[in-house]
Design a protein with these regions (language model features):
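Acidic, low-complexity/disordered tracts enriched in E/D and polar residues
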Residues: 1-43
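Long, charge-rich, low-complexity alpha-helical segments
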Residues: 31-88
Length: 88
């Protein structure tokens, strides 16, 4: 899968928000926020092909977590991103 184009990740007061750059990408009823790990993952894969294994390896390289936790978090992140329509 790949991140959809037209989004910018912004940090505002320690929070990470994904902003649509065009009117058709903006849903004013739903704000897409990321925690630090999700923001890191987005920055690493933005515009590139990736899968759950890619995210798992990125988490293992950046954070001190077990492989089991990294896999679980990677899969949950992908599911969240699919649900809000920012990957395809």
């Amino acid at each position: 899968m790949k991140t959809k184009q037209g989004f910018r990740l912004r940090e505002l007061g320690g929070d990470y928000i994904l902003i649509g750059e065009s009117a058709e990408l903006v849903n004013f009823n739903h704000l897409i926020t990321f925690n630090e790990a999700a923001a890191y993952l987005w920055q690493q894969v933005e515009g590139k092909e990736f899968d759950a294994e890619t995210l798992t390896q990125l988490l293992l390289a950046e954070y001190e977590v077990s492989e089991e936790i990294a896999r679980r978090d990677a899969q949950a992140t992908i599911e969240d991103w699919k649900e809000v329509g920012i990957v395809g």
